[in-house]
Amino acid sequence: MTIKSNTPSHDKDCWQTPLWLFDALDIEFGFWLDSAASDKNALCAHWLTEADDALNSEWVSHGAIWNNPPYSNIRPWVEKAAEQCIQQRQTVVMIVPEDMSVGWFSKALESVDEVRIITDGRINFIEPSTGLEKKGNSKGSMLLIWRPFISPRRMFTTVSKAALMAIGQGVRRAA
């Protein structure tokens, strides 16, 4: 059975990562650049928009790079992340649907250091038209993590949604 999205086509590739999730990962990685953002949903002090044409640009960064790619076409983003990790000498972290049966996942395994599966719940992304988290994600999520200076280990690790939420919400409360 195929699950179809009810999201309007103009919003399909514009969903924002929830702040609690980004904050939890930012503590670990120290993000400097959001390489797939809009002026409305950028999560870092520096970001690339559709107008910047991130797939044909250098991801110049002085810290780790965050990427929540358009889910309609993930493969070119996987290829670019692998390239830019080496060229920029920065860690790249990408959030993607947890689907290991697709071609882009096999491509990622050629270069990724870590596949971190988010367990115990699905991520509710921020809907572009409302700015609110929306339930009903049809798949779980995982993180693809490229690290420079090491041979890719292709590690599979897990982290629970609850653990990430506790860390990320703690950051917001402390701020």
Which residues does each PLM region occupy?
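Class I S-adenosyl-L-methionine-dependent methyltransferase catalytic core
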Residues: 1-175
